[in-house]
């Protein structure tokens, strides 16, 4: 039914698809490894930080991303007032809080 030239053409086309499938077999695991080593932990860290910021309350001792220690004096929607020392307060954006060191009991 097919001439020999048509058969050779089909073999060449099949060979090209096979090469594509081999490329996929290499590429898909690389993407999966990248996802589990880079993207997934970063998402988890972002989720934990959002939860920490949501649970901030007056009296918590915190550390900012700039390395400043303070005690939460007042909370706003997007900002927080930290007491750095007695009679010394500063306003920070909530996202600049890196860690809650201890919570008020």
From Swiss-Prot:
Membrane disposition: Single-pass membrane protein
Gene Ontology biological-process entries: protein transport
SMART domains: YajC
GO cellular component, one term: plasma membrane
Cell location: Cell inner membrane
InterPro entries: Preprotein_translocase_YajC
Its job: The SecYEG-SecDF-YajC-YidC holo-translocon (HTL) protein secretase/insertase is a supercomplex required for protein secretion, insertion of proteins into membranes, and assembly of membrane protein complexes. While the SecYEG complex is essential for assembly of a number of proteins and complexes, the SecDF-YajC-YidC subcomplex facilitates these functions.
Entries under NCBIfam families matching the protein: yajC (TIGR00739)
Family affiliation: Belongs to the YajC family.
Name of the protein described by the UniProt record: Sec translocon accessory complex subunit YajC
